[in-house]
């Protein structure tokens, strides 16, 4: 796991590492992490130490000083950094090591970086995925499955707070976009 500055870090780790969690995924476990963090984003700077402590103390996750060391010791990687700007640099050593990769929102800090991440992964034949969990919500999936008939028009609302270092809807806009795309059949 790369970037320990979001509440997704302990949440995903609990799902994977805790057999008592109702959503537990057997066979997968978070075993290593690279702290990361962005000093110029308060939601990163102010939370990274606490989430890092939780991973180490509650889940016994080993911290690595570099991403290159981390990828030598894991089978797959989650990039969880709340700041999309370092995602390309963080993804490069993961892709070079041929490790399957999930990138949490935002996928990158710019369209250029997002396209480069996907290009590198495709070229290296590395599985890469990024998604909003709202795509898999019960109501969204029911509508996609035809519960109300064929969808010909839809509007979506969702959290979409803005962040000064990220353009447009990069920060949270994926939630509404994914819900909309899902019910419209894409």
Model-assigned labels for residue ranges:
Residues 1-97, 122-123:
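N-terminal glycine-/serine-/threonine-rich beta1-alpha1-beta2 phosphate-ribose binding loop
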Residues 6-10, 88, 115, 137, ...:
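A structural signal for well-ordered alpha-helical segments within the folded catalytic domains
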Residues 53, 141, 177-181:
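Active-site phosphate/pyrophosphate- and oxyanion-stabilizing loops and adjacent acidic/basic residues
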Residues 98-100, 105-106:
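Short helix/strand-capping hinge loops at secondary-structure junctions
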Residues 107-166, 176:
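A contiguous active-site-proximal alpha/beta segment in oxidoreductase catalytic domains
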Residues 165-167, 171-186:
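Contiguous beta-strand/loop segments that form the cofactor/metal-binding neighborhood of enzyme cores
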């Amino acid at each position: 796991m790369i970037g320990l500055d979001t509440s997704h870090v302990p949440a995903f780790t609990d799902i994977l590492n805790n057999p008592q969690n109702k959503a537990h995924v057997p066979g997968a476990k978070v075993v290593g992490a690279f702290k990361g963090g962005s000093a110029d984003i308060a939601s990163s700077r102010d939370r990274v130490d606490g989430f890092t402590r939780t991973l180490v103390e509650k889940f016994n996750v080993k911290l690595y000083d570099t991403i290159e060391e981390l990828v030598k010791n894991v089978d797959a990687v989650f990039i969880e950094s709340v700041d999309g700007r370092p995602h390309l640099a963080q993804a490069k050593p993961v892709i070079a090591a041929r490790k399957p990769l999930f990138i949490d929102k935002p996928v990158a800090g710019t369209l250029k970086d997002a396209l480069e991440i996907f290009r590198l992964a495709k070229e290296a034949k590395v599985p890469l995925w990024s998604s909003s969990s709202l795509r898999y919500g019960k109501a969204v999936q029911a509508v996609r499955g035809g519960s109300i008939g064929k969808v010909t028009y839809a509007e979506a609302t969702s959290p979409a707070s803005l962040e000064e270092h990220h353009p447009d809807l990069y920060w949270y806009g994926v939630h509404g976009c994914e819900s909309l795309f899902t019910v419209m059949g894409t």
